[in-house]
């Protein structure tokens, strides 16, 4: 007995396989679509300097004096004050006292310790690069229960005492850093989310196959039943991995 009246089983199976391939192709294409981003706004032009609000009005009020006249202020003007000679003694500021290096004890999760020597002006990022070259993004420093996440913060601003303990946590994996979103720009609208519909479609197809296997058991040999069971197990693991918190 054919699955569909008037249509051979080979044609039905062929169309089912083509439908599955089409769904997989659409899901693969949807994962490679790039999100369009809005262009960054151009920086506003520089404002022109403001023109002076008041003109020099004092020059208009000066009166011209006669050529032979002599100002009374010139008669009574005394000799100009002579500048005092420079004694040559300048107050010299005492030089800054040299800062002492900090001895830090880096303690790991396995209770092993490593002594690091740094300066107060060194930053958290430079300390990571010095002690853990190539693993800066995987190292987390913790001091008194507080995560030191700002790599630009200096050690002197933390007021670390001598021979203090910094707990180090080195993660095994780290994702690529996400660039910060520029101001004034918003993420563009996402494309067609076909990838999120793939799992429900596969579940619907799986339920249809199990229904056909139960209703038309003679058309499903042992190998087809085992393949259907394996596909069900694989799809269950995929769903668990996707929706696991």
Curated annotation (Swiss-Prot):
Region annotation Required to release iHOPS from membranes: where it falls in the sequence: 2-30
The record's account of how the chain is modified after translation: Isoform 2 seems to undergo a selective cleavage in the C-terminal region to release an additional cytoplasmic form.
Keyword Ubl conjugation included in the entry's annotation: no
Transmembrane segments: 11-31, 194-214, 219-239
Tissues in which the protein is found: Expressed in adult brain; at protein level. Isoform 1 (lHOPS) is highly expressed in small intestine, stomach and epididymis. Isoform 2 (sHOPS) and iHOPS are abundantly expressed in brain, liver and adrenal gland.
A GO biological process held by the record: ERAD pathway
Keywords: Cell membrane, Cytoplasm, Cytoskeleton, Endosome, Membrane, Nucleus, Phosphoprotein, Postsynaptic cell membrane, Synapse, Transmembrane, Transmembrane helix
Protein's UniProt name: Transmembrane and ubiquitin-like domain-containing protein 1
Species for this entry: Mus musculus (Mouse)
Gene encoding the protein: Tmub1
